[in-house]
């Protein structure tokens, strides 16, 4: 970490409490962001992390916007929350399926994504699914673009977009589109906020798993959050914009 620190590293995202303590001890002025893999779903755990030195909490994907709002109202700490990308079928940071199934730890950034594989589902020895719903553990990707005003007004300080194992085209386009609508909301407010269908189509074209979902932010959707039919859909962007 020393060469990165000396080069001006802004902050580190940490999941392991031992690493957290090590960084706080040896780099006391380094900002620590508590990773979503810490499964912070409420005020009390987040307060403890702040007392230990965390400057930002990356909330669990399983929190709804009301819970995030309560966190913002009761705790003076930066909040970062996911708005676009993959959802885990398990609680953030608590899935060990990849470790068991292939020795690749999700908390070390090496998840093999066994949840994206097709499975046969049995009830009392009888198979109850078929090839039309065989991806029983695979959630749709999150897209919170339509509810961005609600996300911002809940107290979220920073929007998190999935980037791991994604190419530069994906990162550039998704960031560009979200930047456009953050600026729109800040300039026009809620009444002037309107999402162009073409931008949703572009997000869908570049990467999606059958359809998008807003995740847990506005409700618990259960089966509606799952991409049961197809594993993944990828295509080239239908429109290219100049990213400045």
Where are these regions (language model features)?
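Active-site-adjacent beta->alpha loops and helix N-cap segments on the catalytic face
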Residues: 15-27, 62-75, 168-170
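Conserved, mostly hydrophobic/aromatic
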Residues: 16, 49, 81, 161
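Hydrophobic, secondary-structure "cap" segments at the distal end of domains
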Residues: 62, 83, 89-149, 153-154, ...
């Amino acid at each position: 970490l020393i060469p990165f620190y000396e080069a001006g590293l802004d902050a580190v995202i940490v999941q392991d409490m031992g690493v957290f303590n090590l960084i706080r001890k040896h780099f006391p002025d380094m900002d620590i962001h508590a990773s979503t893999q810490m499964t912070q779903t409420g005020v009390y755990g987040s307060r403890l992390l702040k007392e230990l030195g965390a400057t930002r909490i990356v909330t669990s994907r399983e929190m709804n916007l009301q819970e995030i709002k309560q966190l913002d109202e009761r705790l003076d700490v930066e909040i970062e929350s996911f708005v676009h990308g993959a959802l885990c079928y398990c609680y953030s940071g608590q899935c060990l399926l990849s470790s068991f199934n292939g020795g690749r730890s999700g908390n070390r950034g090496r998840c093999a994504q066994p949840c994206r594989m097709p499975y046969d589902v049995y009830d009392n020895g009888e198979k109850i699914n078929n090839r039309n719903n065989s991806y029983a553990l695979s959630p749709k990707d999150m897209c919170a673009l339509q509810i961005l005003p609600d996300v911002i007004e809940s107290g979220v300080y920073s929007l998190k977009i999935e980037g791991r194992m994604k190419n530069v085209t994906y990162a550039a386009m998704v960031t560009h589109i979200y930047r456009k609508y953050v600026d729109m909301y800040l300039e026009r407010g809620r009444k002037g906020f309107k999402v162009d269908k073409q931008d949703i189509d572009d997000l869908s074209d570049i990467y999606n798993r059958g359809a998008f979902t807003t995740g847990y932010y506005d409700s618990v959707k259960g089966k509606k959050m799952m991409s049961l039919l197809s594993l993944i859909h990828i295509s080239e962007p239908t429109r290219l914009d100049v990213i400045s």
